[in-house]
């Protein structure tokens, strides 16, 4: 699926994404001709629902992206996002993407996942036999919460909650 960001009102997010935006200022070609407003529309936090249910939060994130003009269409690859829920205070309750990668078909025998795990590291290509295997890999790395009153990390495939083999 391909991502499209339509014209939209102010998307903000600069205060959350300042390190990314500084990097993009130094290397504007990394946006492939897109604007930092498009980057912020996708990666700026979205106001979270008052819930710890990942399906409720996934729908909240989808609606937040839609309000910013972020949509996905069918194509050969998918964006996989690890989404975190933070409740900093009574007035700060947000969802944000903590990690992202691209999922590609590997013919009849699995899936390729491309990710950048750290600025100083090269991109990594890993082959998985299934979405369930990819989910296990990502959750082992990022599901590190201990009894918080927030939603545990969850995965989105484009704008759909990824539940093992369910998202496609």
Enumerate the language-model features and the residues they cover.
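Surface-exposed beta-strand edges and their flanking turn/coil or helix-capping segments
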Residues: 94-96, 125-131
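Short, flexible loop/turn elements at secondary-structure junctions
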Residues: 84-87, 104, 117
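Long, positively charged binding patches that form subdomain-scale interaction surfaces
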Residues: 8-95
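Catalytic nucleophile-His microenvironment captured as a short glycine-rich beta-strand/loop
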Residues: 92-114
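Low-complexity, Gly/Ser/Thr/Pro-rich intrinsically disordered linker/tail segments
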Residues: 111-120, 128-168
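Short, small-residue-biased leader/transition segments that mark boundaries at the very start
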Residues: 1-5
